[in-house]
Regions:
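Sec-dependent N-terminal signal peptides
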Residues: 4-13
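Generic secondary-structure transition motif, activating predominantly at the C-termini of alpha-helices
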Residues: 13-14, 29
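Sec/Tat signal peptide C-region and signal peptidase I cleavage site
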Residues: 15-19
Length: 254
């Protein structure tokens, strides 16, 4: 009887240790490249932040803000992560004689992420995701009557214990016949609880010039389940947003 009791205790302790040993939190923000890794099964995560951008074209200036943006994530299966989110959007448009400001609720999106392959040698870790903006969601200028679908193939090669190269490629479609491409390349490093990245990305416009940008940022893991981040980006040509700032948090529950 005592032996059975000890065996049960050991099994319970092993299960508890395994359930808790999931490493430190990682997020899909603030970079343009989503994390290739998925949340462990039965783990819930909240990611939220502030995004500001400014762009000036031919004397017309547009300032946009997410106040805030929000993504909810859940590890449903070892190979499937469920995600959904939205944002409160502010926009200020200004030219020589007219100033307009609007605050609206952005469209609601769902974005499952699928694990495809674990890294082995030169073979990268691979996953895929698709952001589906639900038709008719959002208000005012942010309302999307047709919906949209943004697809991403996500890849990552570990270069060392604290350095990795991630890259993504995909398409952006608004369901009205317009489809553009996207790609990004990101180098990231970790130094204990501090992480940093730099990233090159481009929107490949169908029938038009590409928008090219560069950004970089840092993140700090305050605890294994809570992190903060800050990033800044610049447009490298006139077709990209001039400058943007991104800051936020991630909180994990398990």
């Amino acid at each position: 009887m005592k032996k059975k009791f000890l065996v049960l205790i050991m099994i319970s302790m092993a299960g508890f240790t395994q359930a808790q040993d999931i490493g430190s939190i990682f997020t899909d923000r603030p970079s343009q490249t989503d994390a290739v890794a998925l949340l462990p099964k039965n783990v819930f995560q909240i990611e939220s932040g502030y995004f500001w951008s400014n762009d000036e074209v031919l004397g017309n200036a547009t300032t946009s803000m997410n106040i805030p943006n929000l993504m909810l994530k859940y590890g449903l299966l070892p190979w499937l992560e469920l995600r959904a989110g939205t944002a409160l959007l502010y926009r200020k448009q200004e030219n020589i004689s007219i100033l307009t400001t609007n605050t609206e609720l952005g469209g609601i999106f769902i974005a499952p992420k699928l694990k495809i392959l674990e890294p082995k040698g030169l073979i990268p870790r691979i996953s895929a995701t698709a952001y589906l903006t639900l038709p008719g969601t959002g208000t005012g200028f942010a309302k999307d009557n047709n919906g949209a679908l943004n697809t991403r193939l996500l890849l990552e090669n570990p270069l060392s214990d604290n350095l990795s190269l991630a890259y993504s490629i995909g398409t952006d479609s608004d369901f009205s016949g317009n489809t553009n491409g996207f790609y990004s390349i990101m180098l990231s490093a970790s130094f204990g609880r501090l992480g940093a990245f730099t990233e090159f990305f481009s929107n490949v416009i169908n029938g038009g010039p590409n928008a090219v940008g560069l950004d970089g940022g840092v993140g700090f893991t305050l605890t294994d389940n809570f992190t903060i981040d800050l990033a800044i980006g610049l447009g490298l040509n006139t077709y990209a947003t001039d400058i943007f700032l991104n800051s936020g948090i991630g909180y994990r529950i398990h």
